[in-house]
């Protein structure tokens, strides 16, 4: 329908009429308006009722939560108070009154913090750090029932802490009158509290095959790699593969490796050694040789001894630490005797020294290597004063270069050794180490 402006204006004016006009124009308007207002009031009442119910429910929920929190907090407070009371009671029962003496048992129950405050030295731990420790001689020692067990000792060193042998502690005991196996434990500690241990198993047996007349102490000098021979190659050198062959033969044939205290007791007729006993020694402590000794002795688990020249005491001590091995024991080859100046034998300086000078040398060189069980005379030269000094120094054995076995009844201050040359065949080696 086309737009009629007059009609539109009339409708607008009708909407703006006062209430009386609307009532006149529409007699039912009032009742309709009242119904709308009543309905609106009813809706508002219903809405208020609903809101009131929701508010009440929310209030109840909040009150319940507050009660729960209060209850939980109360429990925490009660538990804390109980724990505090329990701790106080424990302290009161642990720490004695100052008027009462503290028993040994109570002292051991003191909290660790007190022990740390009183501690003056590092506590040992199970971490060995860089300590290397090994048993002197065979780790399986044999004793005939009724004979005395001879303690062979152990050796230890650390690249960072040097020689540790003098501080080794020995524990365990052997009843040599009762057959069985016994364990001796050696413990070395450094200044940082690191602890390393080695064990010896002592077998007390009713009987065994023994050495009858003597024992071979082998004398080697230097070891070299076949691909890099020394320029001054001579009989004092042995190629590493041949030394490896020697060690393999000894192990394959069940040889036993006695300690120097055992050798001394055997030579003096006080102790039996198992059949096929042998001692391996290497003179001078040359760097390359020490590297081979560490590798080969560890490979075959054969103990060997390096007689170290200690003229440069710092360098010698550093070698002991650098080449520390469970299977390499370091002993003295003197500080000032490995040089010419004497008038006997090979012209070694020992014959120009007094007994006291020799004794001082022995003690100082033993301190460098950390052990005083054995000594090798430089150039094999010895004198009566030298032998007296060895005895006064308390060494178990001292060795010359006289080419022979050590026999029962020999003088332990001047024992023989069997020279091993790199030029010898394996058959010659076998002949030299076996008792005929």
Language-model-detected regions and their locations in the chain:
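C-terminal domain-boundary segment and adjacent tail
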Residues: 238-272, 313, 391-436
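Serine/threonine-rich, repeat-prone extracellular segments and beta-strand-based repeat modules
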Residues: 161-200
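Metal-dependent polysaccharide deacetylase catalytic core of the NodB/CE4 family, i.e.
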Residues: 213-237, 274-278, 286-385, 411-415, ...
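Solvent-exposed, low-complexity, repeat-rich "mucin-like" stalks and linkers
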Residues: 111-161
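N-terminal Sec-pathway targeting helices
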Residues: 60-78
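N-terminal targeting leaders characterized by basic, low-complexity, disordered sequences
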Residues: 1-63
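Short beta-strand edge segments in extracellular beta-sheet folds
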Residues: 201-209
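Hydrophobic single-pass membrane-insertion segments
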Residues: 85-101
């Amino acid at each position: 329908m086309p737009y009629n402006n007059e009609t539109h204006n009339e409708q607008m004016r009708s909407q703006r009429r006062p209430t009386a006009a609307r009532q006149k124009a529409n007699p039912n308007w009032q009742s309709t308006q009242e119904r709308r207002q009543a309905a609106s009031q009813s809706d508002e009442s219903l809405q208020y009722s609903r809101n009131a119910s929701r508010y009440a429910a929310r209030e109840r929920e909040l009150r319940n939560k507050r009660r729960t929190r209060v209850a939980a907090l109360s429990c925490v407070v009660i538990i804390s108070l109980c724990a505090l009371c329990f701790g106080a009671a424990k302290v009161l029962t642990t720490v004695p009154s100052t008027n009462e003496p503290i028993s040994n048992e109570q002292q051991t129950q003191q909290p660790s913090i007190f022990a740390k405050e009183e501690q003056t030295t590092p506590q040992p731990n199970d971490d060995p750090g860089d300590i290397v420790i090994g048993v002197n001689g065979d780790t399986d020692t044999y004793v005939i029932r009724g004979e005395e067990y001879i303690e062979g000792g152990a050796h230890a060193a650390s690249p960072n802490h040097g020689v540790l042998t003098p501080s080794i502690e020995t524990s365990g005991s052997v009843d040599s009158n009762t057959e069985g196996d016994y364990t001796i434990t050696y413990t070395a500690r450094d200044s940082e509290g690191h602890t390393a241990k080695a064990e010896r198993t002592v077998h007390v047996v009713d009987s065994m095959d023994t050495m009858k007349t003597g024992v071979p102490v082998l004398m080697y000098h230097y070891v070299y790699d076949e691909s890099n021979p020394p320029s001054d190659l001579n009989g004092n050198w042995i190629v590493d593969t041949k030394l490896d062959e020697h060690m393999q033969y000894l192990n394959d044939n069940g040889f036993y490796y006695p300690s120097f205290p055992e050798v001394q007791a055997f030579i003096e007729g006080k102790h039996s050694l198992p059949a096929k006993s042998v001692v391996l020694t290497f003179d001078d402590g040359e760097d390359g040789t020490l590297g081979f000794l560490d590798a080969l002795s560890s490979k075959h688990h054969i103990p060997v001894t390096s007689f170290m020249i200690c003229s440069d005491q710092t360098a010698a001590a550093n070698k002991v630490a650098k080449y520390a091995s469970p299977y390499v024991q370091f002993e003295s080859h003197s500080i000032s005797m490995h040089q010419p100046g004497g008038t006997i034998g090979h012209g070694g300086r020992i014959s120009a020294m007094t007994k006291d000078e020799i004794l001082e040398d022995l003690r100082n060189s033993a301190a460098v290597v950390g052990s005083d069980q054995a000594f090798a005379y430089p150039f094999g030269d010895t004198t009566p004063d030298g032998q007296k000094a060895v005895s006064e120094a308390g060494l178990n054995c001292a060795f010359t270069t006289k080419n022979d076995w050590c026999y029962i009844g020999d003088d332990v201050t001047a024992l023989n050794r069997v020279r091993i040359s790199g030029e010898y065949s394996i058959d010659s080696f076998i002949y030299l180490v076996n008792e005929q």
